Amino acid sequence: MTTAFYPGSFDPITNGHVDVLVQALNVAEKVIVAIGIHPGKAPLFSFEERAELIRLSLAEALPGKSANITVVAFDNLVVDAARAHGATLLIRGLRDGTDLDYEMQMAGMNRTMAPDIQTIFLPAGTASRPITATLVRQIAAMGGDVSAFVPAAVLQALTSKRKA
């Protein structure tokens, strides 16, 4: 069974992330969504909240296939975490040339550290290219409508956070 590792902060998961996950299931039988835990960062959503939002979003977007996706946390090197979970593929989504430049650099470093793990680049669909979790958080914090950018569960969670 081919296992792919898709790391990110997913704070929150967006339609762009979901698009990449749908594509990832076309190249791997199992995908591990790995939420990076960084002590120096203060995320909007806790790990538990992000994990639940990912599960809810994928159950909606991938009925019957969400069982092929596991959500985990990691706080070490991506390649070490991927290897620990038995992954041989590292999934990276690309929105534009800027993403490609950065991701190519990271892929080179990762390949040097872990030649047994191959990086797969998956291009974002046209509708999800402009979406970033940072922009979603900023727009939502100012009361803007982010319904076109996030799954329904995330929209509800963002609305609840704003009212709190």
Curated annotation (Swiss-Prot):
Homohexamer. Its EC number is 2.7.7.3. NCBIfam families: coaD_prev_kdtB (TIGR01510), cyt_tran_rel (TIGR00125). Pathway: Cofactor biosynthesis; coenzyme A biosynthesis; CoA from (R)-pantothenate: step 4/5. It comes from Rhizobium etli (strain ATCC 51251 / DSM 11541 / JCM 21823 / NBRC 15573 / CFN 42). Its main location: cytoplasm. Its cofactor is Mg(2+). SUPFAM superfamilies: Nucleotidylyl transferase. Keywords: ATP-binding, Coenzyme A biosynthesis, Cytoplasm, Magnesium, Nucleotide-binding, Nucleotidyltransferase, Transferase. It is an enzyme of class 2 (transferase). The record marks H17 as: Transition state stabilizer. Substrate binds at S9, K41, V78, R92. Reversibly transfers an adenylyl group from ATP to 4'-phosphopantetheine, yielding dephospho-CoA (dPCoA) and pyrophosphate. GO terms for molecular function: ATP binding; pantetheine-phosphate adenylyltransferase activity. The gene is coaD. This is Phosphopantetheine adenylyltransferase. It catalyses: (R)-4'-phosphopantetheine + ATP + H(+) = 3'-dephospho-CoA + diphosphate. It is found in: Cytoplasm. The lineage of its organism: Bacteria, Pseudomonadati, Pseudomonadota, Alphaproteobacteria, Hyphomicrobiales. GO terms for cellular component: cytoplasm. Disulfide bonds: none annotated. GO terms for biological process: coenzyme A biosynthetic process. ATP binds at S9, F10, H17, G93, L94, R95, E103, S128, R129, P130, I131, T132, A133, T134. Belongs to the bacterial CoaD family. InterPro entries: Cyt_trans-like, PPAT, Rossmann-like_a/b/a_fold.
